[in-house]
Amino acid sequence: MGAPHFGPGGVQVGALLLLGFAGLVSGLSLEPVYWNSANKRFQAEGGYVLYPQIGDRLDLLCPRARPPGPHSSPSYEFYKLYLVEGAQGRRCEAPPAPNLLLTCDRPDLDLRFTIKFQEYSPNLWGHEFRSHHDYYIIATSDGTREGLESLQGGVCLTRGMKVLLRVGQSPRGGAVPRKPVSEMPMERDRGAAHSAEPGRDTIPGDPSSNATSRGAEGPLPPPSMPAVAGAAGGMALLLLGVAGAGGAMCWRRRRAKPSESRHPGPGSFGRGGSLGLGGGGGMGPREAEPGELGIALRGGGTADPPFCPHYEKVSGDYGHPVYIVQDGPPQSPPNIYYKV
């Protein structure tokens, strides 16, 4: 039975397949949303509407005020951005335990938070979205530091600062153009990359657990569930193969082990090189059992009593069994064997 073998070629093929699968499940990066009153998309007719698909990513950005950038407002605006269901978003209300995305409270830093639209999140606190459902990103504060904790109204009502996310749906009319991930300047400064494009989304940032203060780079997007599952499956198969190979090697080594050492039988103490069993019973010579040791005990002379015409197995409760046997013709000195 051969053990499974995983050569370097198999590992390389598995890695290539995993990379290809991860490439298939990666989505697109939507145009970022710059969250402050300088973003004119909030005042657009019909509101700020996006049509993300499962697998897409969306960046929410809080432009800094010091030094001012291309998307900065005249004065810094303080916001907390919440993800809410459709009915709550239409009323501009956040629940008592809101789903906080980003807090814009760092005037000297550009803050960013990346949303990954996925049905199942590998992160315990990750966000999950259902296709063909509507969600809202809203800000319910009034733009001041003192109003950060407000959970209803605010700029969502007064300035229309909310974004409607129509997940898995097609746009009616004009859709916000989407670019592939490779074309998005993810590693460059967002302000410089999009300064010449007036139709970009504007969203304030918040240094939450998933938000980072960014100079040139932001947080890495969370891994997609299919890619994580594929990697875990490949690792499980590899571990299973290694365990099988180890088990097969142990099994073969055990089979190749020599059988338990046995004590050689007693030497040839009589005719035919075997222990002779006393006459009378018509029994022929008997081969020594494993572990027996026969030692001849000779009598003192002809005055010794005749030996027994049979053999008897003495109790072996306290050691190896002992046999008393007869060997040789009656006229010769008696040979008695016992086992030590």
Curated annotation (Swiss-Prot):
Extent of Basic and acidic residues compositional bias = 185-200
Q: What is this protein called?
A: Ephrin-B3
Alphabetical UniProt keywords: Developmental protein, Differentiation, Disulfide bond, Glycoprotein, Membrane, Methylation, Neurogenesis, Phosphoprotein, Signal, Transmembrane, Transmembrane helix
* PANTHER family listed in its UniProt record: EPHRIN, EPHRIN-B3
Looking at the keywords, is Glycoprotein present?
A: yes
User: What intrachain disulfides are recorded?
Assistant: C62-C104, C92-C156
Q: Which residues are glycosylated?
A: N210
Q: What is its main location?
A: membrane
